[in-house]
Amino acid sequence: VPFSKPSNQNLEGFLAQSFPAASAAGVVCALPGLSDGAWQVVVDDETLVARRDVRKSRARSPRQYRALKRLPATLARPRYCVNGWLAVTFLPGEIQDALPPVPQLGALLYHLHQQPRFGWRIELLPLLLRDWQQSAPSRRTRFWLRLLHRLRRAGEPRPLRLAPLHMDVHPGNLVWQQDKLMLIDWEYAGDGDVALELACVWLDDETRQALIIDYAHRAAIDETQLRRQVARWMPWSGLLMAGWYERRFQETGDRTFITLADEAWRQLQTR
């Protein structure tokens, strides 16, 4: 499916519909990121981030809107959700190239997981099947198909502890405000196993083990039990990441996603 980046006209139509009394609405810039489709805009002196679901999902933007409504008011607040467009308040701060130290990251995730649940469960198998079906046929390997069949037969691990998850924790989704960290981009959020969140964070193996130790202490979970549960989720999270890169390559034609996918496959094959 050809990828079509949202145009300024589409954005202006959304703003006119959502903010009819606005005296001025100007597109400041298209925000960088692998997902595309995000714009920083100013409406009557209020800075917002507007994002359109370019894949025309009927559920994703409303879910993100509801997720942000349930989260603490210190996070980005949802303003409008119309026809696949979502506008949230802009969080000022710095985006850094690396994740925070393990104690800070563990505290951030534990605090999130203490919040009330969203009300909808994360189901990985439909996402894995979608990525396979919407990827380039030439990129569908026997290894991918075998792993997909194996996970489908096994089924998802039984949750160790259910909580609201972000599911996309990486440096680009963390805003640093002095001594405070804020998560942004909640489009993949939902309720799931806390061990799944730890398996999905973009970390090397050594740092992930340190995070497991830190989190187990905070959450009063047996460290060995948590480590084993994260290990059960690792093939799922690895395939989710590799499949996402493959699908994004098919949508955009950007070979950056091939490089990222190849590295994700390498990691899956060496585990």
Task: Label each residue range with its predicted role.
Residues S7-A22, R117-M167, Q177:
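An alpha-helical support segment within catalytic cores of ATP-dependent transferases
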Residues Y215-R271:
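Helix-rich C-terminal or lid/interface subdomains of diverse kinases
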Residues G84-A98, Q114, L127-P137, L239-D254:
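A glycine-centered beta->alpha junction motif in the catalytic cores
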Residues E46-A87, L91-Q114:
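A conserved alpha-helical element in kinase catalytic cores
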Residues S35-V43, A50, R152-L198:
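Active-site acidic catalytic loop and adjacent metal/ATP-binding pocket
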Residues Q177-R227:
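Active-site Asp-x-Gly
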Residues A21-V43:
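ATP-binding glycine-rich phosphate-binding loop
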Residues P72-L75, L109-R117, G155, A219, ...:
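A general structural signal marking secondary-structure boundaries and capping sites
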